Amino acid sequence: MAPDFYREAFRQAGMATTSGAAVEWTPQLALETMDAHGIAMSILSISFPGVHFGDDRAARALARRCNELAAELGQRWPGRFGAFAVLPLPEMEGALAELEFALDKLKLDGVILLASHAGRFLGDPALEPLLAELDRRSAVVLVHPGMHPSSRTLGLPWPGFMLEFVIDTSRAAINLLFSGALERFGNIKFILAHGGGVIPYISWRLSVAPIISPLVPQWPQERIFAGLRRFWYDTALCATGHALPALMQTAAPERILFGSDWPYAPAKVTGLSIEGIKEAPGVTDRLRAGIERDNALQLFPRLHG
C-alpha cells in the first residue's frame, strides 16, 4: 500500500520509485483492482524504501501511522485486506517495540522486512535480536528487496526493479541460508518476493559451492536444497513460463503464493501474471489452486474465517 501521507514522506525525503513512475493508491482503488482480477483478499504492505529516511523518531511515527491504517482497513473491509507490519529499521529498539505493538495490539498478519537495512543483509548478526523475536512468535515475514548502497554505485542507467531488486533478495536469501540463520530461527516463515530473485536459477550452483570453495559451509547438497525449500516464494513479476518451471523445481509446491506487486507494477501486470500462471508449463489445476488460494490459507489460517 502507498497512502498519501506515506508518499508525501517519501517525496520529502527526496526518494523516487525504482521504476521512475508515479504511484497512485487508495483502498477504493485497491478494491476495484482486486475485483477486476478476481482477487478476494490482499495482504497489504509498505514496500521499498520502508519508513526510515534518516530520522529515528520520524521513522517510528511513520511506521505506527502506516500500521494503524493497515489495521483500520482490515477492520473496515474484513475478508478483503490483511497486512504485514512495517518496522522502523535499522533502529532496533524502535523496531522491536513496533513489532510488539503491531502483532499484539493491532493483530497484523506478519511483518515485511527489506532484504538489507543500512547495508546489512538479513542474516547479519546485527539483525539477530529482531530475528530472535520473530522466531519466538513464529512470525510470517515477507522479504522485499531494496537498493543496497552498492547498487547505487554501479553507474547503470536502468531502474532498480529490473535487476538490482532480484539480486538484493537473492543476497539476503543466501546470507540467511549459509549464515545458519534460516536454521537457527526455524520458526520464522520467510516469504521471498519475486520468486526468490535468481535463487531458482542458481540453486544447483549454490548446492555445489561447498565442493568448490572452503569459504562456504561444508554442507551436503541436499542440506542446501532443503534450506531453499524452507522458504516460501511469491510470484510477483515472475509468473511466466520462463520462470515458474525453475521456481517449481526449487520450492516446495505448497510454498508458492500469488503476488502482484500492485500498485508499483500496474494493474495490467496483475492480469498478465494471472494468465502467466494459467499458461505456464507444468502448472496443473491443483498447483494453480495452491498458488492462487490454498497455500495462502495454509500460511494464514485466520483467512479461513
Residue spans for each PLM region:
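Active-site gating loops and adjacent loop-to-helix segments of metal-dependent hydrolytic enzymes
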Residues: 1-25, 148-169, 206-230
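Histidine/acidic-residue-rich catalytic or RNA/ligand-binding cores of hydrolases
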Residues: 7, 52, 151-158, 196-211, ...
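Acidic-and-aromatic substrate-binding clefts and catalytic sites of carbohydrate-active enzymes
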Residues: 21-25, 51-52, 89-95, 118-125, ...
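Conserved N-terminal glycine/acidic-rich loop preference
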Residues: 140-143, 147, 167-178, 182, ...
